[in-house]
Amino acid sequence: RGDIWLINLDPTIGSEIKKTRPCVVVSPQEMHDFLRTVIIAPMTTKGRSASYRVPITHDGKKGLVLLDQIRTIDKARLVKRLGAISNKTLGASLDILQATFTP
């Protein structure tokens, strides 16, 4: 959880964010130990700010973690580990996800 991976998101349909891009792993390690899938949130440098998008600076570029585009992917889509987000960014991301999925 909190690692940034380069991930191949293609093929996609409609408004799903596409191409190979950095993504943040948001699922916990306990899931990774038993499943062949991980839950990720794509990153972008071109999107618009919103309450469900967390600002991030990675590799000298400002961007957003797109929590509105989370998805489960097979580990075969993982291309390369690029680093990790800060604890502050991870905490903000998990807070938004919790607010999204709890009544």
Predicted segment positions?
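Conserved functional hotspots at enzyme active or ligand-binding sites that engage polyanionic ligands
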Residues: R1-P103
